[in-house]
UniProtKB/Swiss-Prot annotation:
Chain location of the short sequence motif Nudix box per the record: 203-224
A cellular component term, taken from the record's GO annotations: cytosol
Cofactor binding note from Swiss-Prot or TrEMBL: Divalent metal cations. Mg(2+) or Mn(2+).
Annotated protein name in UniProt: NAD-capped RNA hydrolase NudC
Cofactor: Mg(2+); Mn(2+)
Organism: Mycobacterium tuberculosis (strain ATCC 25177 / H37Ra)
Binding sites annotated in the UniProt record for a divalent metal cation 2: E218
Keywords: Hydrolase, Magnesium, Manganese, Metal-binding, NAD
EC number(s) on file: 3.6.1.-, 3.6.1.22
Amino acid sequence: MTNVSGVDFQLRSVPLLSRVGADRADRLRTDMEAAAAGWPGAALLRVDSRNRVLVANGRVLLGAAIELADKPPPEAVFLGRVEGGRHVWAVRAALQPIADPDIPAEAVDLRGLGRIMDDTSSQLVSSASALLNWHDNARFSALDGAPTKPARAGWSRVNPITGHEEFPRIDPAVICLVHDGADRAVLARQAAWPERMFSLLAGFVEAGESFEVCVAREIREEIGLTVRDVRYLGSQQWPFPRSLMVGFHALGDPDEEFSFSDGEIAEAAWFTRDEVRAALAAGDWSSASESKLLLPGSISIARVIIESWAACE
């Protein structure tokens, strides 16, 4: 276990969706001739309308781009290069059955992948999901409502008449573990969640806010606590549909009463480190555990933050 002070700790591991995998090769986005030159030998990631991909043996299954078309179609997005320099593109399309019956392929989305996916696969799938979700909802300009077309190998959209260019946007959100500097931390259950399902407090950053100010405001709004010593831990992209989760921890007072004024949180409680460790050992939200406390799955930064705090001595 990590021997750290009671008021500070760091993440013990990098969240799955934050790890460096494929080379994003961003310089090729503005050189379509070079990007297209790699198409005949490129790999293709199909993402269906439910944001699912085919996975087998811990890796995403990639097809041959040339089987889709003889050149990149306008709706394809360039994800980068994998080992050996092979280009990878993604499209929104139905998943194709695997011809080999010995390959145990299954259709899963990012939420269901957890620890079964390697770093490169997780980066490819998360980038593809984020980009394709954006294209699905950005066919008209936010500036004037005019139709737009994909550009930069799928990394922007352009008004073909005016030349106005728009890029994928993200919505920054904070997620925070509130603890007492000793042996207890706050976990909360949203009103929409089943009984026993708890996680960290989170919320979107408002205009004019820093991340730290957002942490203090969100926790005050959601459970009525005043926090201090807000400290950064790490970040993770979360393409559901386009969030960037920025993780923190902060000190709170267990003697301060909870209040749930905005209706988003149904209940919150202080849990001891031993209670949290037991819940982590029992599994996660998807398990059949009878534990009184069910925690987020391994793909989320929430899980990594909770695990890191629980490992403190």
